[in-house]
A protein has these predicted regions:
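Long, charge-rich alpha-helical interaction segments
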Residues: 187-227
Length: 357
């Protein structure tokens, strides 16, 4: 009956937006802020979940419980190991009147792409390795919004490790401070980052950063960031002093242990500064490939110069990413020297990671 069809259409009308984004860096945070501005522009109720790859199962279980919701996922690649969990969650959400938009810049398999594009209700998948996720979100969702354009510029500076914008570098440290603090206190990372996310969505960087004073508007956050910077510099110098090096296929490969409270991005930037290295050891040179090993057995890959493909190296350790930066997993370990020897051996048996971009 016409009345029933009209009622059904109203019931399936999108009324809210759920943002799922990466919690580890500025790109994920700014992507969520851009999505929030989109929700406001469309008059949709907004909720965000900031997460990481190890939490996909719970996140997609939550997605599957949504109804009449636009689900926008940003700065997260498809985790092949739980592809079926992702598929089940998305299919259930779509069956309940939801629509899926996925915006990302990581490497995707054909199977993962088909999983998203085969969904009902006109799914959108945009994957582009030339941009960070916030830039993609800006171009797809809010191309004429100046605040979103600014958020995308900040994210690009951090995600491509340019370090040309002072406020972008500061925001990176702020995200780390807040995230590590939440983890230490066993609090939800999303809840801890929400105040900053909300200010970014409202006013862009001017909501949290003062260009005149070169400081955060939140004085307590400023103090936390200052302390974090001093503390991590000490930790990274100590970690670099105990590095392991080996020449493999003509490339200098270096492995360092990441101390707690330091990210692989921090270590990658620190260890690529020749002045810093020379102050530790005059003979220490920037490595062609730097591997940062976390206490939990996760691997970060950063290159010191062209001629190395981090994503190809990470693939050898169940990971992936970009030519200039990537992530993988070694697993829990006890002996750093034994792990280094094993990693060096694995890299020596493969040449795919050696080559021009």
């Amino acid at each position: 009956m016409p009345e029933e069809r009209e009622s059904d259409a109203k019931a399936r009308r999108i009324t809210s937006l759920l943002s799922i984004s990466h919690d580890k860096d500025v790109d994920g945070l700014n992507s969520a802020a851009i999505v929030w501005r989109y929700a406001r522009a469309k008059g949709l109720d907004f909720k965000a979940i900031l997460t990481d790859y190890g939490s996909f199962e719970q996140v997609f279980l939550t997605i599957g419980k949504q109804r009449n919701t636009l689900v926008i996922i940003t700065d997260l690649g498809m985790d092949e190991t739980i592809l079926e969990v992702v598929k089940t969650g998305l299919e259930r959400a779509v069956s309940r009147g939801c629509r899926v938009v996925w915006l990302d810049h990581h490497q995707w398999s054909e199977r993962a792409i088909k999983t998203v594009l085969s969904l009902e209700n006109k799914p959108v998948l945009k994957v582009n390795h030339d941009f960070c996720a916030a830039e993609i979100a800006h171009k797809v969702l809010m191309p004429r919004d100046e605040i979103c354009a600014g958020l995308a510029r900040i994210a690009h500076d951090t995600d491509f490790n340019l370090r040309e914008i002072e406020s972008a570098t500061a925001l990176t440290d702020a995200v780390n401070v807040i995230r590590f603090g939440a983890i230490d206190k066993k609090e939800e990372v999303t809840d801890s980052l929400y105040p900053v996310l909300e200010k970014l969505a409202e006013s862009g960087m001017s909501g949290v950063w003062d260009d005149d004073t070169h400081k955060f508007k939140d004085s307590l956050l400023n103090k936390r960031v200052d302390h974090y910077r001093k503390d991590k510099a000490k930790k990274m110098r100590k970690a670099l002093a105990h590095h392991h090096d080996q020449i493999i296929h003509g490339k200098l490969v270096r492995i360092v242990e990441i101390p707690s409270g330091v990210t692989s991005t921090d270590m990658g930037t620190f260890a690529s500064n020749q002045e810093v290295l020379s102050s530790i050891d005059p003979e220490l040179k920037v490595a062609d490939l730097l591997l940062s090993l976390s206490q939990g057995g996760m691997l970060g890959f950063r290159r010191g110069r062209d001629g190395v493909l981090c994503n190809a190296a990470a693939k050898l350790f169940n990971g992936g990413g970009h030519p200039y930066a990537a992530g993988g997993e070694y697993g829990l370990y006890e002996d750093f020297q034994a792990v280094s020897d094993d990693i060096f051996l694995t890299l020596s048996k493969n040449t795919n990671w050696v080559g021009e971009v």
